[in-house]
Design a protein with these regions (language model features):
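Bacterial N-terminal signal peptides that target proteins for export
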Residues: 2-12
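Acidic, glycine-enriched catalytic cores built around paired aspartates
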Residues: 13, 17
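N-terminal signal peptide c-region/cleavage motif recognized by signal peptidases
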Residues: 20-23
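Surface-exposed, glycine- and small/polar-enriched segments that build interaction surfaces at terminal
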Residues: 26-194
Length: 194
């Protein structure tokens, strides 16, 4: 019986240590650029059922693990973000974000974002988005993989059935590829922006 508690204690201590290291890394190198950085405290662990019923509250930053049973919403999230239905962040996300249905963030500086239906990033995204639908303001140095990918300004790779970018300095691979601000705005299979 005592061995079970020892294993549990070791797991909790490991998670706490990882979370504190991520928190320090987030403070030292990944300074949030989003306007939502409220200067609130940062927690290594957050548990959410839905906005308004979560610990800690929405105004906190999470630097470690955020577990959203249904839907969770916080300012900035650094490290691992897991949601049963949806993850919502008003500010910046860095690390890994996985949701059953939907992810929504303000911006990212290095994020693997995976969702069952859609990923949305309001501003600048750096990283990899994987979902049937990916929508982002600006991708600089990233990939979008899905059925439909949409971005305003793009540097990287879009891989999907339909890819749309207003401006692109990257590659699109898919059935229909659209770069609005291009000499050849619509091409099948491959479209390159310069």
């Amino acid at each position: 019986m005592q061995h079970k508690y020892s294993l549990l204690k070791a797991v909790v201590m490991t998670v706490a240590l990882c979370a504190s290291n991520v928190s320090m890394a987030a403070d030292a190198r990944m300074v949030p650029t989003a306007s939502y950085n409220s200067g609130c405290a940062q927690t290594p662990l957050a548990l959410s059922f839905f906005p308004g019923f979560q610990l800690p509250g929405e105004d906190w930053d999470v630097g470690g693990l955020r577990l959203d049973v249904f839907v969770g919403r916080h300012n900035n999230v650094y490290a691992l973000d897991i949601g049963g239905l949806a993850n919502l962040s008003k500010g910046e996300n860095c690390g890994i974000e996985v949701a059953g249905i939907y992810n929504q963030i303000g911006s990212s500086k290095g994020l693997l974002q995976v969702a069952g239906i859609a990923n949305y990033c309001k501003d600048s995204f750096v990283g990899l988005q994987i979902a049937p639908i990916n929508v982002t303001g600006t991708v600089s140095g990233g990939w979008q993989i899905g059925l439909f990918n949409r971005v305003e300004a793009f540097t990287g790779l879009q891989l999907g059935l339909v890819n749309y970018a207003y401006q692109s300095k990257g590659a699109q691979i898919g059935l229909l590829n659209i770069i609005s601000d291009s000499m050849l705005p619509v091409l099948p299979i491959v479209n390159l922006g310069f």
